[in-house]
Amino acid sequence: MSVNGPGVVVITGGSAGLGRALALSYCAPGITLGLIGRNAERLEAVAAECRARGAEIVTGYLDVRDAAALQAWIFDFDAQHPIDLLIANAGVASTLRSSDDWEGAGRTAEVVDTNLYGALHAVLPAIERMRDRRRGQIAIVSSLAGLRGMAISPAYCVSKAALLAYCDSVRPVLARDHIGISVVMPGFVRTAMSDVFPGNKPFMWSAEKAALFIKKRLTRRRVQIAFPFSLTLGLKLLRLLPATVADAILGLLFQIPRRNM
């Protein structure tokens, strides 16, 4: 890692949305990017954009739910390009779609496997190598939904809340080995993923604006990166209210489908 920032960056979920915007924000001559994604065509398109800006790109067509494959790729990549910064960004969204909808075991497991375990499958191998070097930086993309559960997306909220708790838990331990870990908590970002959520999307940011905001604060090694400010403050204040009052307020903002009796 140079004084100007990380020279080697790995980003999961790098083929679209926020991951693509992050890749483009970091790519420059002298930078090596490891981009991981499931869609080979889209990932290669992002890689081509980054190469055009002078960065060295290594792609991995992987599903983050495949722990063994992801660990093998990260170990192999790190052996050639010691990772300065890993951004665990891959994720999926899920919401209740109708009055009779319910997130059962299958849907809940799919979301948790990708958002929670997929992130851990990426960061744990990287941390292992960073601890050997006694340096490095990890960023995990959670969500403001991790601050307070919403009835419209239970599985998504629990997966993101778990990431926040994980970062808080391991931060003091990793600090002993000079490894920083940051939790990124975006609000609504204009991507295909946000299209899954119906109704109001207050204070929505573009992916490009979000990526630059995140990069700037990762450079400063901020432990929590939450945005936008108004929505962050509102959700933190909701946690101080009685649960029934907070539920009612969120119900007005993010209406769940009503069931006809």
Where are each of the predicted segments found?
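C-terminal helical subdomain
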Residues: 183, 199-234
